[in-house]
Amino acid sequence: MLFKNVQVHGATGSLVTDVRVKDGMVADAGTGPDTEIIDGSGLGLVAVVPATRKDQGHMVGRVEPGIPADLLLVPRGSMPRLGTPWWRVIVGRTDLRALLTRGRVVIRDGEPLDRPANPDGARIGVWVDQNDWLHQELLPQGRYDETRGGRRHAYTGRYWLDGDRIDYLDDSGFYAFGEFIGDQLFHAEFVMRRQARP
């Protein structure tokens, strides 16, 4: 896969370049056969990289050769800042042009591609923030239902797990992300733990 003329964060600022993905990794641009070419004109590409401390999960980072191709493609004006925790990123559905996980496209032009929501069911349950204000229920069929401040069904939508990361597509039209770090779920400004089952 080749992203042509896409903006990335470089070591000395932003630049427009070509980015090649091969075997699940970001490769040197070079030349070679590409099964798919994506026009990146007007778009920006960022990487999802491990944070500097392991207990902080992942963050928005530079797209560089040799890293896993966990990539987000959005309009340039919507590019999240370097260093932003991944679980704080929110993108409008129509702005999310592509999301790649280990080089595999899982969202394209705002549409989720076929993948299992919760392959082993390990994260199913109600996750509650420290102030008991947010209750996020991850349902077995790949749906979530949030109660916020006692208001039931405040946000509802679909979710997909990818290792310790979770992708949300809200019914109201935006994507958000989260991450399981230890026994906690980080999402937006919330830190949640799974509620004990009765």
Give the ranges of each region predicted by the language model:
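N-terminal metal-binding scaffold of metallo-dependent hydrolase/deaminase domains
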Residues: 1-34, 43, 69-73, 78-85
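C-terminal cap of metal-dependent C-N hydrolases
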Residues: 17, 71-110
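His/Asp/Glu-enriched, well-ordered alpha-helical/loop segment
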Residues: 50-76
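Lipid interaction determinants
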Residues: 94-99, 104-198
